[in-house]
């Protein structure tokens, strides 16, 4: 089933949904700006950049497991980076034509919250760099 947005294009329907008021109540102002309004946190501001413990990175909006430390790498970009999600359903992607460029936006596969972008310049085995906003992630140590 699909719905139509104000721009008359199909909008994806996600298993976990909340009203805008419920998202505002659930998320901090910065999380809402990034996750629901497709913002970007400043580089090098997330404590998750330096996180070295084993564990899982979940969506800060709905708790969906997204990435593990086994896929995390130091990209030098200032954002937590991973070479692959936990599984094919963890995240989704859409084309992002904002800011005068074409990028691939990454969102939570369960609630649709904006997580970051994926670029084709990561390490083996995928050559992908999932560049995530730390504020969109909730780290759970193993």
Task: Kindly give the residue locations of the regions a language model identified.
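Short, contiguous pre-domain boundary segments
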Residues: 1-20
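A short Gly-Trp-Pro
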Residues: 14-142
